[in-house]
A protein has these predicted regions:
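N-terminal Rossmann NAD(P)H-binding glycine-rich loop of SDR-like oxidoreductase domains
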Residues: 10, 14, 18
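Catalytic Tyr-X3-Lys loop
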Residues: 72, 79-101, 117, 134, ...
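Active-site loop immediately N-terminal to the catalytic Tyr-X3-Lys motif
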Residues: 79, 126-132, 191, 209
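Amphipathic alpha-helical dimer-interface segment in Rossmann-like NAD(P)H-dependent oxidoreductases
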Residues: 92-112, 149-150, 154
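Catalytic loop of short-chain dehydrogenase/reductase
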Residues: 117-140, 145-153, 165-166
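Short, small/polar-rich loop/turn modules that mediate ligand/substrate recognition or access, typified
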Residues: 153-157, 214-216
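A conserved structural motif in NAD(P)-dependent oxidoreductases
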Residues: 188-199
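Short C-terminal tail/terminal secondary-structure segment
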Residues: 215-231
């Protein structure tokens, strides 16, 4: 069985992914809370990605899969965003991920088959108003992932998932009533917004041996929003 580490897995996409992986893998979840995990076959490590240093002594010597799930959605007009907000988004989405990866690099190298899955946003490829901060932070993730995939091939693979708006606690303020849900669904060519399972299933595929010839790619799991013009 593979050892897979999820940073953030108590809610949303991370929780859906943990449920998907638990039966055929050893799943380790590092997150602030173990809420929602009691009935799952996973190991939990208390960890706050914004402040803590990951305790590798509580992890196996070999890590075969790594997923970094913390994210932010700060949508504001550019003129009203303070530089500190850009820095905070970059810190959470990119810098903290880099810190964790450098911490567990020996365990990833020990695997000889490790897979890394990172998260971007549809707003990187498709310019959207009010997305300057999140697009900048997630753009850093995409560039980093491709460079890392090149540097460490064939030791391990690195891929990115770029979702559109997905029904998770992080996106609740954008989907918390029927009107918002209808408008969001209408914006997508497939006429619905994403669900956590839509994204989790792609992540599970990228962590599996079924994707063994895929690396350095960005997958747009976004209901067609980034590429299809159907209206």
């Amino acid at each position: 069985m593979k050892n897979i580490l999820l940073i953030g897995g108590s809610y949303g996409i991370g929780l859906a992914l943990a449920k998907e992986l638990q039966h055929e893998n050893n799943v380790y979840i590092a997150s602030r809370t173990s809420e929602n995990l009691a009935d799952l076959k996973v190991s939990h490590l208390a960890f706050d990605a914004t402040n803590d240093v990951l305790d590798v002594a509580k992890l196996p010597e070999t890590i075969d899969g790594f997923v970094y799930l913390p994210g932010s959605i700060n949508l504001r007009p550019f003129k009203g965003i303070k530089p500190e907000t850009f820095a905070e988004d970059l810190q959470l989405n990119f810098i903290n991920m880099v810190k964790v990866l450098q911490t567990i690099l020996p365990q990833l190298m020990a695997s000889q088959q490790a897979n890394i899955v990172l998260f971007s946003s549809v707003a990187v490829q498709t310019g959207m108003p009010f997305h300057t901060s999140v697009a900048a932070a997630k753009g850093a993730v995409e560039g980093f992932a491709k460079a890392l995939a090149a540097e460490y091939a064939p030791k391990f693979r690195v891929n990115v998932i770029a979702p559109s708006l997905t029904n998770t606690p992080l996106a609740d303020k954008f989907l918390n009533n029927e009107s918002k849900q209808e408008k969001s669904a209408a914006r997508h060519p497939l006429k619905r917004f994403g669900e956590a399972d839509d994204i989790a299933q792609m992540a599970a595929f990228l962590l599996s041996d079924k994707s063994s010839w895929i690396s350095g790619q960005v997958f747009h799991v976004d209901g067609g929003l980034s590429t299809l013009l159907v209206n």
